[in-house]
């Protein structure tokens, strides 16, 4: 199983990986972009992902934290300076490849996580489609505060 998780916030924030609520059967989800922060409503839940009280993704297996802790922290530091505007620019591919080369982690939102036909799309289009009813975020700057690519 392979998955991407991209954490997005309206402000820079510290985020800890919480692996306490994972279930081995939660394997149907292949990609999600997740807003964190109480000020942003989450309109839907995705199978296989639990959202904690602070809005962060809760992983399923405890071994993910120990195995990816250093990679997660390195990626978080790298992504914390990148803005929403940078990720929806024409440089998205170059940014992704640079991160992949340095950290071995992809930053790719994947459409329709419950569908078998996955394809990469820009962060901009993912957010616009997922949050198209939330006009108040149209001019908001978002920060990538963490990104994880993992296998099990």
Q: Which residues does each PLM region occupy?
A:
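Low-complexity, serine/threonine/proline-enriched polar segments
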Residues: 24-118
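Acidic, proline/glycine-rich low-complexity IDRs
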Residues: 1, 109, 113-152
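Short, extreme N-terminal segment that most often corresponds to the first beta-strand
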Residues: 1-38, 142-152
């Amino acid at each position: 199983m392979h998955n991407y998780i991209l954490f997005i916030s309206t402000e820079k924030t510290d985020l800890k990986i919480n692996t306490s609520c994972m279930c081995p059967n939660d394997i149907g989800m292949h990609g999600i972009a997740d807003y964190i922060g109480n000020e942003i409503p989450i309109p839907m839940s995705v199978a296989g992902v639990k959202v904690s009280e602070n809005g962060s993704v809760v992983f399923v297996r405890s071994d993910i934290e120990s195995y990816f802790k250093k990679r997660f922290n390195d990626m978080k530091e790298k992504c914390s300076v990148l803005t929403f505007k940078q990720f929806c620019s024409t440089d998205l591919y170059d940014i992704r490849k640079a991160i992949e080369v340095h950290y071995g982690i992809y930053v790719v939102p994947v459409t329709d996580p419950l569908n078998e036909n996955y394809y990469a799309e820009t962060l901009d289009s993912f957010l616009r489609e997922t949050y198209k009813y939330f006009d108040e975020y149209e001019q908001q700057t978002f920060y990538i505060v963490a990104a994880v690519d993992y296998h099990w």
